[in-house]
């Protein structure tokens, strides 16, 4: 809405003598029933991510059946509903076995994505699309990536680009980062600006640990 209002203001001159916000007036004429996308909390973000990831994994008919099953389970177990292996195995064992990675990724990322994106589902979908694109590009180059490591690295790139650049430009000859090792050990001597940064500390707690990983290809 802000982008459209800004574009209208730049296109059309204000009417002299009239205190009219031309951008706002235009939007009110154009959009009769504005729909606000609600923010998602951590559990809602997790479920949303699981649905997006499984949609890419399953054919249309099977995905629709799974969504019906999950919605039914959600109604029955509203307060303690959780999508996990045990829930999926009751639906289809093959699907449960083949989607473990997707479920784990959603559980890994949802808390920090929910906080970092303020529960915005559109930006969450954009992040997952970027993750998928990175994987496809790596596959095209015959490079095998660990999705959990890639996702964690992308979180840093997305939310803390300065720290990401510091880490990526200072890898040792084995592709390891001394900055990550220090931060994982709660040593902020060389990264004092992040000592009280709750986001960075939450990011460090996300599995897997990266201190001894070769990050060169990420």
Where in the sequence are the language-model features?
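Sensor-1/coupling segment of RecA-like P-loop NTPase cores
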Residues: 1-18
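The feature marks long, low-complexity, polar/acidic/proline-rich intrinsically disordered regions embedded
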Residues: 39-218
């Amino acid at each position: 809405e802000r982008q459209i209002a800004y574009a209208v203001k730049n296109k059309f001159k204000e009417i002299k003598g009239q205190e009219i916000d031309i951008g706002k007036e235009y939007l009110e004429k154009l959009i009769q029933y504005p729909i606000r996308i609600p923010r998602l909390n951590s559990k809602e973000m997790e479920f949303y991510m699981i649905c997006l990831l499984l949609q890419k994994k399953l054919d249309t008919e099977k995905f629709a059946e799974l969504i019906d099953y999950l919605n039914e389970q959600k109604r029955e177990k509203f307060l303690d509903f959780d999508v996990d292996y045990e829930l999926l195995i009751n639906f289809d064992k093959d699907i449960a076995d083949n989607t473990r990675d997707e479920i784990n990724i959603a559980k890994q990322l949802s808390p920090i994505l929910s906080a970092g994106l303020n529960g915005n589902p559109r930006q969450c979908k954009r992040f997952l699309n970027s993750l998928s694109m990175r994987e496809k590009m790596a596959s095209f180059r015959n490079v095998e990536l660990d999705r959990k490591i890639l996702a964690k690295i992308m979180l840093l790139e997305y939310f803390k680009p300065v720290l990401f650049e510091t880490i990526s430009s200072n890898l040792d000859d084995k592709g390891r980062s001394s900055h990550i090792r220090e931060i994982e050990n709660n040593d902020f001597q060389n990264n004092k600006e992040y000592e009280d940064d709750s986001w960075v500390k939450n990011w460090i707690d996300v599995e897997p640990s990266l201190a001894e990983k070769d990050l060169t290809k990420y």
